[in-house]
UniProtKB/Swiss-Prot annotation:
GO BP terms, alphabetized: regulation of DNA-templated transcription; response to stress
This protein's encoding gene: ycgE
Endpoints of the signal sequence: none
Annotated keywords: DNA-binding, Transcription, Transcription regulation
Protein name, entry field: Uncharacterized HTH-type transcriptional regulator YcgE
Residues in HTH marR-type domain copies: 7-143
Amino acid sequence: MSTRNSRSELEKTAVQLFRKLGTRTVLFHQAAAQALGLFPTDLKSADILNEAGPMTAGELGKKTGLSTGSVTALVDRLEKAGYVAREKDPNDRRRVVIVPLTASKKHIKDLFRPLSESTMDLCREYTEEELELIFSFVGKAADIMEEELERLKQ
């Protein structure tokens, strides 16, 4: 096999593996949401809030691509389940921000702990240099996914 064919096959394999990982990730998050009594979009929105911190419903809508009405219903569900609270914006008392609650972070973290531990075990199979290369590649792949997400939203 020539280097060109080998390279082409490796690239195809990368695409196939990312598709496989993406599918497994979606299915895992659906099961995790169900275990928490949430819808998958609710769980991912809670994750966005835990990662980015407090934001308005409009900002959450932009990040998720959900309509205003859908975000309102989603925040209602998350608030009722104890994952978020609505608070007045300390910088503008006319605005309301959605704040992730610390207890909910722990609850979600506990659910994901086995996956995190398995991922750390996997990392131990590689050298620091290999991990840096893997992280660079995966980080760039995540950037591509973000760009494609924005393209689809337009």
